[in-house]
Amino acid sequence: MGVIRDSWYKMARFGMGFRNRAEGGQGTSGKPMTGSRETKFPPKFSAWRRIVVKLSGEALMGALTHGLDQDTLARIAADLKEVAARGVEAAVVVGGGNFFRGIEGADKGIERARADSIGMLATVMNALALEYAIEKQGQAARTLSALPMPALCEAYSRQAALHHLGKGRIVVLAGGTGNPFFTTDTGAALRGAELSCDLIMKATQVDGVYSADPKRDPAATRYDRLTHDEAIARNLAVMDTAAFALARENGIPIIVFSITQPGAILAALEGRGKATLVSPS
């Protein structure tokens, strides 16, 4: 991996010397790092050879209450193009909550497995829209679906995804894991492990992981850095436990950041702005 194996990369990927380097941190005391200052991440793109970005369906709505906001799609597509231009291979896992959420459908009386299947179909709509937006930016992209839909897009396989990534295409992954009862967060962690990604980027509406929902609790504290074990033990709801566990078992760090501003993905990769880094212990 050559220059990828610099000291910053090792700290993020393997947790080496990580705890005592945090800004304003607690060293090796075992307490998560908190604070309001910008989080310093690996400064070189060489630290991240291949990434998977998790985009919720809500992230594609912009100011709308549902559906797709074309300006938001264009902004995210332009950001992804800039990431690819720097030689980083990028896969994107999209959710479907802007159209339908399986768990909400189940709460309204739809059988859970069927509700999740409907939700997976919603992710395909989002993936096709994002693929088109990326291509409009002049960047090659391919949608691969865990639910075979040959009339619309390629079926997902590890080999196909790696092929397209190797050709410099942004791979948009639809259909979650292809199975009910699994979230698209878990799908992102699964694809991250399966595709040997160096980093999972969780795009949210807030600038990192908080001790509680900052929109509901003004006293919520933002963490600069956590380990996977800490995130699981504290039941931090930014990702589900299965996703954190998959990332932990495969040694993949996670950056949680806000997607609401232009250039947000690029900024998080460069270590600019606020975010939370969740690393192996």
Task: Show which residues each predicted segment covers.
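Short Gly/Ser/Thr- and charged-rich N-terminal loops/segments
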Residues: 23-25
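C-terminal catalytic "cap/lid" subdomain
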Residues: 4, 12-18, 34-281
